[in-house]
């Protein structure tokens, strides 16, 4: 059924005289190479004429047809009669000139090319069309609406598209691009503001650091001055204390050198009294003259002597000056009263006896 259908209705792949030419080739006897060789020797000119006729015939009929279909499968050619490469090259231009159609010849290509949604560019125009430039009035109107609100609602988008004569997609894409530019400008403005603030803070920080360094230098200078002043004051205090000590010592030395010792007068009267006593009472019966107190104490009596301890007890017990009696060889000698001041001087003299104190006792013993 399929082979009859193919035979009855010629396909667009094959030329119109394809079946007739194929039948003529099958009816023609096979070509003998020996006869061809003999004919080449005897009638070369006639063979050349036949070749020209065959070429004209092939040119008139077109390229040679493909081999007959396979006996079992009519769509496959037989393996014994496969066409050569040159025959296929000759058929290629004819196949390319005719359109390819399947079945009833519908518009499959049109459906592929025209089916689906139309691809639009960024400004809303189709991919094949040129981009539509907005005029000045449209841009101004869109800018005003963008200033009112950068977000575009569907109703507002439709109104703007109708008012400006644009597609809603064009309006939406313009708003989207405008928002992107606005964000970029805002970022640039924020960056510039932050950069100015950073520069100001850096300058202020540098000024504060310089001021801090100056203050630290002043503190170090003040500390050095305070240390120097404290050292100077300490030196002055030590010098003043040393000078005061030297002045006090000099005053003490002057006082000591100016004031005579308290028992100097008693020491001066001691030798004179000794000479008077020695000259007047040689035989023991001299007159009863006044003699110094210490000489009477040191001189022994005939009947009994007065001890120094008794003298001290008597001086501390009596209110007035003590009176002592000296029994000489011939008469009684009454001792003069001694006041408290002279007695104190005597005690001082006893504490520090001079090396040249004369003791008259050896004279009496002799």
Curated annotation (Swiss-Prot):
Alphabetical keyword list: DNA-binding, Homeobox, Nucleus, Transcription, Transcription regulation
DNA-binding annotation, residue ranges on this chain: 127-186
Pro residues bias: start-end ranges: 62-74
Leucine-zipper: region residues: 185-229
InterPro entries per the UniProt record, alphabetical: HD, HDZip_class_I_plant, Homeobox_CS, Homeodomain-like_sf, HTH_motif, Leu_zip_homeo
Region listing for Disordered, in residue ranges: 25-81, 94-132, 239-287, 312-336
UniProt GO cellular component terms: nucleus
PROSITE patterns found in the cross-reference section: HOMEOBOX_1, HOMEOBOX_2
Major location (coarse): nucleus
Locations listed in the record: Nucleus
GO MF terms held by the record: DNA-binding transcription factor activity, RNA polymerase II-specific; sequence-specific DNA binding
Keyword Transcription regulation in annotation: yes
GO biological-process terms attached to the record: positive regulation of DNA-templated transcription
One protein family per Pfam: HALZ
Composition bias type Polar residues, residue spans: 240-252
Annotated Gly residues bias: 103-115
Ranges of Basic residues composition bias in the record: 36-48
Entry's transmembrane regions: none
SUPFAM superfamilies for the chain: Homeodomain-like
Tissue expression remark: Expressed in seedlings, roots, stems, leaf blades and panicles.
Task performed by this protein: Probable transcription factor.
Entry similarity comment: Belongs to the HD-ZIP homeobox family. Class I subfamily.
Protein name as catalogued: Homeobox-leucine zipper protein HOX21
Lineage, opening ranks: Eukaryota, Viridiplantae, Streptophyta, Embryophyta, Tracheophyta
Gene: HOX21
